[in-house]
Curated annotation (Swiss-Prot):
Belongs to the NF-kappa-B inhibitor family. The keyword Transport does not apply. Disulfide bonds: none annotated. This is NF-kappa-B inhibitor delta. Specifically expressed in spleen and at low levels in thymus. Expressed in a population of antigen-presenting dendritic cells which may act as regulators of systemic inflammatory response. GO terms for cellular component: nucleus. Disruption phenotype: Mice are highly sensitive to LPS-induced endotoxin shock and susceptible to intestinal inflammation caused by exposure to microflora. They display no overt T-cell selection phenotype but an impaired proliferation of T-cells. Thymocytes and T-cells seem to produce less IL-2 and IFNG. The lineage of its organism: Eukaryota, Metazoa, Chordata, Craniata, Vertebrata. Residues 14-23 have a biased composition (Polar residues). Induction: Up-regulated in thymocytes upon TCR-triggered cell death (at protein level). Up-regulated by IL-10 or LPS.
Length: 327
């Protein structure tokens, strides 16, 4: 694009500048900006207004406007000034070639302040890209608790049960992302631990925001408990079984194409994670007498050999013990 704004005028805020800004203290209207060592919001507004609406609405070969580019680079002052103009032309949700609005671009770039600004200016909070992913899906996919916090603090209603084109809610997406971060990988352990921590935080935040833990993904009817068990993640299983709402026994015995979480746990490779998960499920009221579509009980899905023999005896005892007495 010709005569585009020189984005070098709008450096990304330093951590100290970001830290001095507080969402909770904002009134409606323009954000209260710290005193940065660089251009102010008024300076950004002057440059944006000088460009005129034609250049602000122009899209490059990938469909990006200047607002998309500012959001992607974390150029907050320029993004806010550009968004004000696009708001006047009802183009705040203009899409690039993958269907991403500036809000979705800001979320993917992990720019929670810009996410907060765009929402305050009227960006559509439930907009989705060409994969059906909302701002919550994006934050869940990449493990971005700051973005989730920005959405939550905005006070704007968002659809926590929205489905992407894979049939996943943001909570399903967050659990799958957490499971992936905990798999053995070539990345350094410190980076892997950081990813897992952020993604676990996203799971917890979505639950606190009111996401339904009983929602089933469309393709195979799995709940987040099934997904956690399938990934042999005893820590997450224990967290989900400790949720303080709903009928725990009904939740733990929900079926995904005929299989309960206990069926899936019994089919895991033998080892400490499997044993911990089976014990957690039984303690929460999992019914070892339920059968799947192949008429199998969980005990029938244990792998042969001496490894799972202790679990075999436990499941057999639990089939005849009164509820709550299995151990």
């Amino acid at each position: 694009m010709e005569d585009s704004l020189d984005t070098r005028l709008y450096p990304e805020p330093s951590l100290s500048q970001v830290g001095s800004w507080r969402v909770s203290s904002l009134p409606s209207g323009s954000p209260q900006l710290p005193s940065p060592t660089g251009p102010s919001l008024e300076t950004a507004r002057a440059h944006i207004l000088a460009l005129g609406p034609q250049q602000l609405l122009a899209q490059d070969e990938e469909g990006d406007t200047l607002l998309h580019l500012f959001a992607a680079r974390g150029l907050r002052w320029a993004a806010y000034a550009a968004a004000e103009v696009l708001q006047m032309y009802r183009q705040l949700d203009i899409r690039e070639h993958k269907g991403k609005t500036p809000l979705l671009v800001a979320a993917a770039a992990n720019q929670p302040l810009i996410v907060e600004d765009l929402l305050s200016l009227g960006a559509e909070p439930n907009a989705t890209d060409h994969q059906g992913r909302s701002v919550l899906h994006v934050a869940a996919t990449y493990g971005l608790p700051g973005v989730l916090s920005a959405v939550f603090k905005s006070g704007i209603q968002v659809d926590l049960e929205a489905r992407d084109f894979e049939g996943l809610t943001p909570l399903h997406t967050a659990v799958l992302a957490l499971n992936a971060a905990m798999l053995p990988a070539s990345v350094c352990p410190r980076m892997q631990n950081s990813q897992a921590r952020d993604r676990l935080t996203c799971v917890q935040m979505l639950l606190q925001m009111g996401a339904s833990h009983t929602s089933q993904e469309i393709k195979s009817n799995k709940t987040i408990l099934h997904l956690a068990v399938q990934a042999a993640n005893p820590t997450l299983v224990q967290l989900l079984l400790g949720l303080p709402r709903g009928d725990l026994r009904a939740f733990v015995n929900m079926k995904a194409h005929g299989n309960t979480a206990l069926h899936m746990a019994a089919a895991l490779p033998p080892g400490p994670p499997q044993e911990a998960i089976v014990r957690h499920l039984l303690a929460a009221g999992a019914d070892p007498t339920l059968r799947n579509l192949e008429n199998e009980q969980p005990v029938h899905l244990l792998r042969p050999g001496p490894g799972p023999e202790g679990l075999r005896q436990l499941l057999k005892r639990s089939r005849t013990a009164p509820p709550g007495l299995s151990s």
